[in-house]
Amino acid sequence: MSIPVMMTIAGSDCSAGAGLQADLKAAHAMGAFALTAVTCVVSEAPGTVRGIQEVDPALVADQVRINLEHFPVRAVKTGMLCLLYTSPSPRDMRRSR
């Protein structure tokens, strides 16, 4: 039996309580292998957000595409998408695969 592969498209939370870090922990707990596409980096702790830096949408799109090209992704979970409205949607990227 192979391990199912999923991808999370989300922000990075330095306190690991949310964002792609939490998604990685949840996927692991459910027996899945998780890939990531980082949309932004957030400086935060519970109850405090000090800064958000978006990742260039073209780089986010490239992360999604390369994961879809090289791994048998069976599910995609989205979180904080930041400025992804300026690039193709994850659904459009899946169609172009």
List the predicted regions and their residue ranges:
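Small-residue (G/A/S/T)-rich helix-start motifs and N-terminal tracts that mark the onset
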Residues: 1-75
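Hydrophobic alpha-helical segments, especially transmembrane helices
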Residues: 26, 78, 92-95
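Single conserved hydrophobic/aromatic residue that forms the stacking wall/gate
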Residues: 85-97
